[in-house]
């Protein structure tokens, strides 16, 4: 069954707030929002507890098998996207369609509330990603900006939440960020694998200097890191004896549209590209959080990011 037809939680992975008051328990503080505005990322948001982690790891083990009955539903599936010799980087998109817990992860209350505050409006799923770096030979993900791959959607009103399924440390290839790089503007695509520092060729001297002092998002399993679509980020090899598995949930503010005309002659794999000018909605872009219905009058009590990952309301 293709679970993308189900636009509500289908398992008991999460306990959902039953009132607007309970939603406020998940709200980010003004200080956290300020950190996001300043740095372009925000670590330390608990998304999954140990039981939920085990459910997701079990489902990841199932869907990574190309013989999984739902395999054809993946938007992309790369058993090894690494370019380096003797390195492995599993990467896939679209797993939310295949298994119940993977389907329900975007409906995490903590994820939904943070996304609303950081995007400044109603939230839709854009797409998910799975990353696996096996022990001792996990490959890199080079420095990049997410939106450089997403310019087929506009305006820029996007957000990502990176959720490790294993404790993430430098030695097993945790995500790393360049603080403040979300203010550098849109950079050219220089590749996701191969040369970790390929993006440096597109930077000025000050920006190249900033690459020398990245912030390593060392977080426990289940603790998410949110980042802006222009924040430069990447991850080094996993040379440890432990795996580094992670799920990324990519989100958009409701109202983002397709700019698919720029994709002419470009490989889009099995991604559900909508016609030019069409608002992202329908089967593959479910509405996750509607602040008016979930928060009601309490909406005014919830702080929003001043320089959010989305443009102002009149631009969307």
Label each region the model flagged.
Residues 151-170, 218-219, 250-253:
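Short, conserved beta-strand element in jelly-roll/cupin
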Residues 2-39, 45-143, 149-152, 190, ...:
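Non-heme Fe(II)-dependent double-stranded beta-helix
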Residues 49-50, 131-133, 148, 168, ...:
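Short, solvent-exposed loop/turn segments at secondary-structure junctions
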Residues 100, 113-114, 148-151, 163-166, ...:
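Short helix-to-loop capping/linker segments positioned immediately adjacent to catalytic or ligand/cofactor-binding
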Residues 2-22, 66, 72, 192, ...:
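Non-heme Fe(II)/2-oxoglutarate
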Residues 25, 41-43, 160-164, 214-216, ...:
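Conserved hydrophobic/aromatic beta-strand scaffold that supports enzyme active sites
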Residues 12, 16, 168-232, 256:
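Double-stranded beta-helix
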Residues 145-146, 195-211, 243, 262-269:
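Short, surface-exposed loop/helix-turn segments at secondary-structure junctions
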């Amino acid at each position: 069954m293709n679970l993308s037809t189900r636009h509500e939680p289908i398992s008991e992975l999460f306990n959902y707030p039953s009132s607007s008051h309970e939603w406020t328990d998940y709200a980010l503080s003004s200080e956290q929002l300020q950190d996001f505005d300043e740095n372009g990322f925000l670590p330390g948001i608990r998304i999954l507890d140990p039981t939920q982690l085990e459910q997701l790891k079990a489902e990841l083990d199932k869907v990574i098998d190309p013989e999984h009955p739902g395999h054809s539903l993946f938007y992309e599936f790369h058993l090894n996207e690494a370019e380096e010799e003797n390195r492995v980087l599993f990467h896939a998109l679209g797993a939310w369609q295949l298994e119940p817990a993977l389907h329900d992860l975007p409906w995490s209350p903590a994820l939904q509330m943070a996304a609303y505050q950081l995007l400044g409006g109603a939230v839709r799923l854009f797409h998910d990603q799975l990353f696996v770096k096996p022990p001792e030979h996990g490959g890199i993900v080079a420095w990049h900006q997410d939106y450089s791959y997403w310019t087929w959607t506009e305006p820029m009103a996007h957000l990502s939440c990176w959720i490790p399924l294993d404790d993430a440390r430098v030695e097993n290839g945790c995500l790393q960020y360049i603080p403040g790089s979300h203010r550098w503007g849109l950079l050219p695509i220089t590749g996701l694998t191969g040369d970790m520092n390929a993006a440096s060729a597109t930077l000025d001297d000050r920006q190249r200097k900033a690459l020398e002092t990245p912030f390593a998002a060392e977080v426990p399993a289940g603790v998410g890191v949110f980042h802006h679509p222009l924040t430069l980020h990447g991850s080094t090899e996993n040379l440890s004896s432990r795996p580094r598995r992670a799920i990324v949930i990519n989100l958009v503010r409701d109202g983002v549209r397709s700019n698919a005309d720029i994709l002419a002659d470009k490989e889009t794999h099995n991604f559900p590209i909508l016609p030019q000018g069409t608002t992202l909605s329908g089967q593959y872009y479910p509405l996750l959080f509607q602040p008016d219905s979930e928060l009601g009058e309490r909406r005014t009590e919830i702080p929003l990011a001043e320089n959010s990952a989305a443009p102002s309301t009149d631009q969307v």
